[in-house]
Amino acid sequence: MKFAEHLSAHITPEWRKQYIQYEAFKDMLYSAQDQAPSVEVTDEDTVKRYFAKFEEKFFQTCEKELAKINTFYSEKLAEAQRRFATLQNELQSSLDVQKESSGVTTLRQRRKPVFHLSHEERVQHRNIKDLKLAFSEFYLSLILLQNYQNLNFTGFRKILKKHDKILETSRGADWRVIHVEVAPFYTCKKINQLISETEAVVTNELEDGDRQKAMKRLRVPPLGAAQPAPAWTTFRVGLFCGIFIVLNITLVFAAVFKLETDRTVWPLIRIYRGGFLLIEFLFLLGINTYGWRQAGVNHVLIFELNPRNNLSHQHLFEIAGFLGILWCLSLLACFFAPISVIPIYVYPLALYGLMVFFLINPTKTFYYKSRFWLLKLLFRVFTAPFHKVGFADFWLADQLNSLSVILMDLEYMICFYSFELKWDESKGLLPNDPQEPEFCHKYSYGVRAIVQCIPAWLRFIQCLRRYRDTRRAFPHLVNAGKYSTTFFTVTFAALYSTHKEQNHSDTVVFFYLWVFFCIISSCYTLIWDLKMDWGLFDKNAGENTFLREEIVYPQKAYYYCAIIEDVILRFAWTIQISITATTFKPHVGDIIATVFAPLEVFRRFVWNFFRLENEHLNNCGEFRAVRDISVAPLNADDQTLLEQMMDQEDGVRNRQKNRSWKYNQSISLRRPRLASQSKARDTKVLIEDTDDEANT
């Protein structure tokens, strides 16, 4: 592997600009070599003066890079020392409180089931648990800084060696000895001391002297690329996806056959549509995860996941494939229920019962930690006014806004099973008397409109909570206003629908109000998508016209296509209104909703790429590479300042005005590969070292 590729694969993305610009140095050397005057057409003194002038410029640039690296390393080292002192104080305070309250000095003597502990003991137990997590994140930051130290030294050594080879001189090696090998970032060994001290503290104070357990907690898997999934996971992904494709083909033929003989298919579609959207969402989220990893967007940090244990894209594909198989089998069973002894209404209940059990299964199987994380996140979303709102909280609430059809179909299913289903019949497709008007699929009884507003309500109260915490009207109250437009849109849609059914004279008034608020809502959300969520249309975008100053994904066309796609799908309701308002055929609205619901999930899938990219660039601007975890809570002023930094509209702008030369802004970013596979006491990140010039 060439060192340039090795460097790009192992850097910490959030610190990318603080590394040696190896590619820019290579371009300088090759450009100087190509533009050098030939000895055949000019005298030797002219050639020497040319290279002397170039070397002066080259070494001046090296000095600037070295100063930049020294400064950043010193700042991060000082930050690490302060953080270590803080963690030690927090640990000592927790141990002192335990000692005073129980008269014991070791954690081993205090170990007993959590439900047997008093309130004070529960608090201390949580503090110790938080400290373990905080030390593991701090240890990760130390490894990243050590990796930064080693990569930069290797980069200087290789580029100066290349300099000497191209210019046929030894001045590069001399410059390295005089400047690089005595530079603070290389000579300072405090980082190694901090790593050793952290290992000792975790081993002796938090793991009762069990070094193997301590190192298992501290070390992380290689992060230079996506973590390879186990072979059996890869096998299951292929197996489940293959079966799912075959079953879908079977479903198509079965559906064509059944639609020719049975016209009561719409209750079935409404009940199974939500399950399909959930499977589509999980599959597209797997593609999101793969794309983020490939581009170097650190979604693990953004969502504050455990870097040692989180779902990869293959795991998400596996879950989507497994649920897809259950969905297909259940739907096929409904199609062939007339020849079965099991009543047709059992199959949807069995499908969604299995899905719910998969999520809430209390045993530590089937990705227990990830499911538990999701359940906690859902709880935080639905109790938003009572918690501080983090990125993962409002990200999930935004996903629910695109999955509102699932909630509406769930409400329909509950209503259908409660009021419309004939439990004493078992033939046909979810029997419903076609002579009786449908009750559950209409707005007339009010519940449907309320359910449709739930996702927007969750984001609305999250925005109000963030305003309460920060006291900043912009962007939080303005964002709340965006979600409030959904309430008006749904209200007038419901009023129009009910008045149209009853042939009221004021139906047209509610229709125009519905259209008006649809236009307001679509324009509002579109502008927010492009400007605030994606950070596009930046006036300082430079060569990235209509985009932003800094982009992560390699092709600008991705951004332009995403903008067009977002505009089209944000205004797709115009087609729905046009058709439903001019057509009186039954189930036209159902057909359009069934077509547009998967498209909305796809729109959110595209939105996810650029929303997390924008958040990642904010982390890069703050050089934030690990989670900030502390037992001691932030005071109100610190919390407000942190929220302001996170919500800064131009948080990713104006970061490249002082560039000394240009380099490719779209370079593929990947997280650093850490030394998790080294021996127990060897925590140093090994940098690939080769003297083969073909690999440099």
UniProtKB/Swiss-Prot annotation:
Annotated segments matching region Disordered: 672-696
Annotated site (Gating residue for phosphate transport): W573
Residue(s) carrying Phosphothreonine: T690
Keywords: Cell membrane, Host cell receptor for virus entry, Membrane, Phosphoprotein, Receptor, Transmembrane, Transmembrane helix
GO cellular component labels: Golgi apparatus; plasma membrane
Positions in the Cytoplasmic compartment: 1-228, 297-309, 384-388, 472, 535-553, 627-696
Catalysed transformations (reactions): phosphate(in) = phosphate(out)
Intramembrane segments: 366-383
Chain positions found as Phosphoserine: S668
Molecular function GO terms recorded: efflux transmembrane transporter activity; inositol hexakisphosphate binding; phosphate transmembrane transporter activity; virus receptor activity
InterPro entries: EXS_C (IPR004342), SPX_dom (IPR004331)
Region annotation (Important for inositol polyphosphate binding) ranges: 158-165
Membrane topology: Multi-pass membrane protein
Record CDD domains: SPX_XPR1_like
Domain EXS span(s) in chain numbering: 439-643
Annotated TM spans: 229-259, 265-296, 310-337, 344-365, 389-422, 430-471, 473-503, 507-534, 554-585, 588-626
Binding site for phosphate: D398, N401, K482, Y483, R570, R603, R604
Domain annotation SPX: ranges: 2-224
Extracellular side: 260-264, 338-343, 423-429, 504-506, 586-587
Swiss-Prot/TrEMBL domain comment: The SPX domain plays a role in the regulation of phosphate flux. Inositol hexakisphosphate (Ins6P) is bound between two SPX domains of the homodimer. The SPX domain has high affinity for inositol polyphosphates and its affinity for inorganic phosphate is two to three orders of magnitude lower.
Subunit structure: Homodimer.
Primary role: Inorganic ion transporter that mediates phosphate ion export across plasma membrane. Plays a major role in phosphate homeostasis, preventing intracellular phosphate accumulation and possible calcium phosphate precipitation, ultimately preserving calcium signaling. Binds inositol hexakisphosphate (Ins6P) and similar inositol polyphosphates, such as 5-diphospho-inositol pentakisphosphate (5-InsP7), which are important intracellular signaling molecules involved in regulation of phosphate flux. (Microbial infection) Receptor for xenotropic and polytropic murine leukemia (X- and P-MLV) retroviruses.
Entry's family note: Belongs to the SYG1 (TC 2.A.94) family.
Protein name, per record: Solute carrier family 53 member 1
